[in-house]
């Protein structure tokens, strides 16, 4: 398996599809990275030369991906929570942040139902 950005990417897939297995790289960015590195999109990862892999690593180095991106997102959410703004409070309480209704639905964000207290 080829290792790019600390992730083992699948070797039997096309280069651009395999790049999407990296956190922070979607379809558009994966295609842009392949174009920037000069790698044909339809070439399988196992067919890539070491120079092409290095070119992909260099092109990918310009973006914030994997651990750095996860850390940045976590810090952004923590900053909102520390500020005490509306979005931060919603994060803190585990409720939907973007204005969705909560009287019904919102089960994904709120977690499983709590039943009645019993006797």
Swiss-Prot record:
One Gene Ontology term of the biological-process aspect is:
translation
Task: Give yes or no: UniProt keyword tRNA-binding.
Answer: yes
Listed under GO cellular component are:
cytosol; small ribosomal subunit
Q: Which InterPro entries match?
A: Rbsml_uS13_C (IPR027437), Ribosomal_uS13 (IPR001892), Ribosomal_uS13-like_H2TH (IPR010979), Ribosomal_uS13_bac-type (IPR019980), Ribosomal_uS13_CS (IPR018269)
Q: Which UniProt keywords apply?
A: Ribonucleoprotein, Ribosomal protein, RNA-binding, rRNA-binding, tRNA-binding
Q: Residues annotated as region Disordered? A: 94-119
GO molecular-function annotation terms? rRNA binding; structural constituent of ribosome; tRNA binding
Cite the NCBIfam families for this sequence: uS13_bact
Q: Which family does it belong to?
A: Belongs to the universal ribosomal protein uS13 family.
What's the stated role of this polypeptide?
Located at the top of the head of the 30S subunit, it contacts several helices of the 16S rRNA. In the 70S ribosome it contacts the 23S rRNA (bridge B1a) and protein L5 of the 50S subunit (bridge B1b), connecting the 2 subunits; these bridges are implicated in subunit movement. Contacts the tRNAs in the A and P-sites.
Oligomeric state and interaction partners are given as: Part of the 30S ribosomal subunit. Forms a loose heterodimer with protein S19. Forms two bridges to the 50S subunit in the 70S ribosome.
**What is the designated name of this protein?**
Small ribosomal subunit protein uS13
Q: Which gene encodes it?
A: rpsM
């Amino acid at each position: 398996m080829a290792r790019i950005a600390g992730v083992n990417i699948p070797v039997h897939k096309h280069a651009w599809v395999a790049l999407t297995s990296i956190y922070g790289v979607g379809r558009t960015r994966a295609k842009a990275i392949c174009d920037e590195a000069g790698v044909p999109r339809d070439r399988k990862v196992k067919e890539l030369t070491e120079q092409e892999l290095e070119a992909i690593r260099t092109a990918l180095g310009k973006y914030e991906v994997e651990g750095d991106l996860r850390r940045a997102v976590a810090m952004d959410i923590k900053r909102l929570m520390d500020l005490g703004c509306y979005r931060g409070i919603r994060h803190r309480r585990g409720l939907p942040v973007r204005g969705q209704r909560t009287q019904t639905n919102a089960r994904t964000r709120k977690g499983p139902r709590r039943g009645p207290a019993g006797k």
